[in-house]
């Protein structure tokens, strides 16, 4: 069923959370004149819009948005997404932002200001069609949660994490779990001094042939369950320097 919002006056709207969630909305051209200048909440705005194939939000004013949690979650059929004009300088949560965007091949985050983001858990989870992702330049200095961030990105061959600041991160559980196509991932510069959760961090990385975790500070880690489970092509991994004094689960 068509949802025509082309005539809406949204100049005073502050909350657009769940606005089109689980609806038949599919015409992004209706949003060309949307005034989003006062909006602070866009959580789940387009979540479960399974009829949506293309979405152009380049004209959205997101300068006051704080919450983008699950904004595009489970847009199963969306092949094109334009968020090139997004101002994310006030955003604190991008949790599950693109989760289950199964056929989306590219996400352009160039210009994203993520300096205030604290939660990136599950951000790209199950983006099955994405073959490469460059998050170089993304400011992660305030992020505390990266659990399942790249979980299930099965087609991902190349993942560039240059400059990733993980100094404040406490949870990396399942961060790369299920990235079955990745042959190598450079985490040698990761600061893991505050991390408590590493369970399933590399679980199911079937193609992973090299991994340098020799510099990991694991002094605060309590859970390493299945950390390298299913890494069948990984012939060696140096964990000789791991401090497991606080670990309660090594299953």
Indicate residue ranges for each PLM-predicted region.
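Short beta-strand elements of solenoid repeat domains
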Residues: 18-22, 44-48, 69-74, 96-100, ...
């Amino acid at each position: 069923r068509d949802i025509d919002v082309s005539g809406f006056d949204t100049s005073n709207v502050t909350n657009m959370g769940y606005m089109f969630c689980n609806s038949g909305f599919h015409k992004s051209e209706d949003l060309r004149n949307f005034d989003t200048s006062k909006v602070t909440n866009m959580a789940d705005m387009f979540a479960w819009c399974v009829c949506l194939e293309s979405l152009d939000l380049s004209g959205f004013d997101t300068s006051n948005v704080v919450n983008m949690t699950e904004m595009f979650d489970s847009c199963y059929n969306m092949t094109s997404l334009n968020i090139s004009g997004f101002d994310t300088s006030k955003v604190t949560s991008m949790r599950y932002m693109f989760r289950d965007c199964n056929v989306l091949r590219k996400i352009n985050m160039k210009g994203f200001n993520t300096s205030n983001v604290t939660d990136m858990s599950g951000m790209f989870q199950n983006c099955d069609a994405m073959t490469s992702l460059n998050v170089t330049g993304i400011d992660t200095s305030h992020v505390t949660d990266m659990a399942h961030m790249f979980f299930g990105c099965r087609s991902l061959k190349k993942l560039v994490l240059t400059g990733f600041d993980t100094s404040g991160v406490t949870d990396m559980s399942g961060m790369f779990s299920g990235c079955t196509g990745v042959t190598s991932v450079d985490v040698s510069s990761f600061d893991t001094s505050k991390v408590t959760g590493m369970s399933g961090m590399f679980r199911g990385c079937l193609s992973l042939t090299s991994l340098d975790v020799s510099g990991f500070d694991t002094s605060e880690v309590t859970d390493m369950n299945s950390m390298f489970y299913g890494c069948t092509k990984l012939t060696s991994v140096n964990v000789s320097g791991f401090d497991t004094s606080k670990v309660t689960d090594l299953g």
